Amino acid sequence: MPSFYEKPLFRYPIYALIALSIITILISFYFNWILGTVEVLLLAVILFFIKRADSLIRQEIDAYISTLSYRLKKVGEEALMEMPIGIMLFNDQYYIEWANPFLSSCFNESTLVGRSLYDTCESVVPLIKQEVESETVTLNDRKFRVVIKRDERLLYFFDVTEQIQIEKLYENERTVLAYIFLDNYDDVTQGLDDQTRSTMNSQVTSLLNAWAQEYGIFLKRTSSERFIAVLNEHILTELENSKFSILDEVREKTSFDGVALTLSVGVGASVSSLKELGDLAQSSLDLALGRGGDQVAIKLPNGKVKFYGGKTNPMEKRTRVRARVISHALKEIVTESSNVIIMGHKFPDMDSIGAAIGILKVAQANNKDGFIVIDPNQIGSSVQRLIGEIKKYEELWSRFITPEEAMEISNDDTLLVIVDTHKPSLVMEERLVNKIEHIVVIDHHRRGEEFIRDPLLVYMEPYASSTAELVTELLEYQPKRLKINMIEATALLAGIIVDTKSFSLRTGSRTFDAASYLRAKGADTVLVQKFLKETVDSYIKRAKLIQHTVLYKDNIAIASLPENEEEYFDQVLIAQAADSLLSMSEVEASFAVARRDEQTVCISARSLGEVNVQIIMEALEGGGHLTNAATQLSGISVSEALERLKHAIDEYFEGGVQR
């Protein structure tokens, strides 16, 4: 029987037909043997033709398969030899055993057989060793996606040059939105006559229009102090390469009576949604203004932010009206809360503790229980004397609690006030930030990309000398029943004195007003000086660090111990060394680099204002203020930290350090 008849689908019906035919023949033989004989002959003929048809079908199928196999073999050969896909076989020593003509033509060679991968495509060898499955590499000015089959020692090369060019073109042409804000327009133009104000407006508009025309930017003025700019990613790259020189140009050419206009620019990029672009641009502008203005902030969808500019000391812009409004808003929030928990940053300083005590008085003035969170394991030598003095006042010391106690007493109506920092990673106890919903942030540092989530109230003034100064102003507008005793006023004054280096840095008229208010409340300046005293041992140790100071770029002092003199330094001691260096002649900025423990290298940075050390420290994952900043680096040596520091300084002077 033909082979396909053996399949059940065909076999059973045929068996049934044959059985039926045999029965029919038998019946015919019974009645008429001649008819039976004829039927037998007919059945034999039918079976013969079925067999013959099966044979013909099998021959046709075999012929078709043979033709198809030949065609497939031909296609395979042509694919190997003619298709624009590179194929390469190599041996254990990374020598090429075979390569198709397309791949040879990519290297402008007639054949690659016998050549080493190190000579022809060296960048592929590390991928093979690293067990990478697929990667894009550059060979002879073209881009290839290499697929690696290690078991067969086979490489496929897909030319993706045009695809990458199209992707690059798409990226370059994506829309970018920028909001431009004249930081101090009202301050500069107030008091000017109409003609002078009009001249200044024309000058600013002319500068910005010329800048926009040079780079092909659409620019529209939306108000006296606001502009909107539309550009693309390619233009943004050019602006980044120029370090946004328009900032310096506007500042230099709009000076009036020693006061110049400055720009803040918020840029939204790398998304296709216009709404998201607008949100990113506004968020970037808020960030630039929160950091003191005179700078550009570029915020990307992944949360990363790049900064340009911000090298000048920001002008004092806050007013007593704003302080009064914030104070009243804080009073309302405190009144609606069940209790108040105040928290500063890790390893608190005088400013952090002084400001926390000030907010404690705000809570008490509004008849609410207030508590200050402090970790006994994080009390540094710089505040030990202050804490020791506070312990003499039981009523005040009883308000200090540990992070664990704070977690226990917090509830849904608790208010958390964070002072002297705005970064969740730096607070005394991050669990409180995650647990408590109602949060207020009071800080004087420039705003960074990391920020407390959804605060009810934010009072950030980078123009202030210290957080203690901001809190002192808030105290002045609290209910009259507020009473501040000597130790509380002294703690606030100590915070101001430490952050201003005894009123020598970042000191404005409002700083002296706050100090005067605290002195009137009984602040003891002699006690403050006792807080600031140091031991002979710490003085000698600090001198040892300063002894190995070198000058970099003529006016930058860098102090660090040689690698062969491994020694651990307290963070406060490192900061004091940087302060001491700043008092040297011809030193504009100082950096003290030392190991705090086995894993951590600390860098403290100080400046007189000409050099923005905050930007330099941000490049090293740190932060701070224009004249006072620091960072901590883990897992590196002091010499490696010095190299990274010098690289950040070089980038700063070349036109702006970015993150």
UniProtKB/Swiss-Prot annotation:
Region (PAS-like domain, required for heme-binding): 84-149
One GO term (biological process): sporulation resulting in formation of a cellular spore
Listed result of changing D420A: Loss of phosphodiesterase activity, does not confer antibiotic sensitivity when overexpressed
A GO CC annotation given for this chain: plasma membrane
Residues that bind Mn(2+) 2: D351, D420, H444, D499
All copies of domain GGDEF, residue ranges: 173-301
Activity regulation, free text: Phosphodiesterase (PDE) inhibited by Zn(2+), Ca(2+) inhibits in the presence of Mg(2+) but not Mn(2+); c-di-AMP PDE activity is competitively inhibited by ppGpp. Heme binding (by Fe(2+) or Fe(3+) heme) inhibits PDE, activity is partially restored by KCN or NO only for Fe(2+) heme. Binding of NO to Fe(2+) heme switches from hexa- to pentacoordination. Heme binding inhibits the ATPase activity.
Transmembrane segments: 9-29, 30-50
Keywords noted in UniProt: Cell membrane, Heme, Hydrolase, Iron, Manganese, Membrane, Metal-binding, Sporulation, Transmembrane, Transmembrane helix
Chain ranges on the Cytoplasmic side, renumbered to this chain: 1-8, 51-659
Enzyme class: hydrolase
Membrane topology: Multi-pass membrane protein
Family annotation (PANTHER family): BIFUNCTIONAL OLIGORIBONUCLEASE AND PAP PHOSPHATASE NRNA, CYCLIC-DI-AMP PHOSPHODIESTERASE GDPP
Name of the protein this chain belongs to: Cyclic-di-AMP phosphodiesterase GdpP
Lineage, broadest ranks: Bacteria, Bacillati, Bacillota, Bacilli, Bacillales
Gene for this chain: gdpP
